[in-house]
Amino acid sequence: FHPDFSGRENIYFNASIFGLTRKEIDERLNKIIEFSELEGYIDNPVRTYSSGMYMRLAFSVAINVDADILLIDEILSVGDQHFQEKCYKKIEDLKAQGKTIVIVTHGMDTVNRFCTRAVWLHQGKIKMDGDAESVTKVYLEETA
């Protein structure tokens, strides 16, 4: 996001980077804002947003651009419990639609809840690659 742009301007800016036309963004704008729950702040510069607000807006844009692959990098670690659960439900919906979701996390519960495959990286190298349950089990044993 551009820190001096408002949340609304950043929606247009970022959605256009993902290839959406102005008309497509116009059609999705209210849905994006509503999901983010930032209605009262959407016209403020994002530099005034907390990390949780920033994450809400980023996630809301990402899930509304119809990408085939969604990359979630520790993004849900800053949101409140209500919004996290809302995001988790959306992730489950996207997974059910056959979307590919790549989650970067240190949360093994998150890995086991959403992933069929897990890759454990250690010092920039793949330490283990396999089904989520097996990888998280070994990870927890070795890092305890």
Regions found by a protein language model. Give the residues of each.
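H-loop/switch region of ABC-family ATPase nucleotide-binding domains
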Residues: T105-H106
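A short, surface-exposed alpha-helical micro-motif characterized by mixed small hydrophobic
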Residues: V111-R113
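Conserved ABC ATPase "signature" C-loop
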Residues: Q123-G124, Y139
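ABC ATPase "signature
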Residues: D129-G130
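Conserved ABC ATPase "signature" region
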Residues: Y12, S16, E24-Y41, A58
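Conserved ABC ATPase signature
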Residues: P45-G52
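Helical segment within the ABC ATPase nucleotide-binding domain
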Residues: Q84-Q97
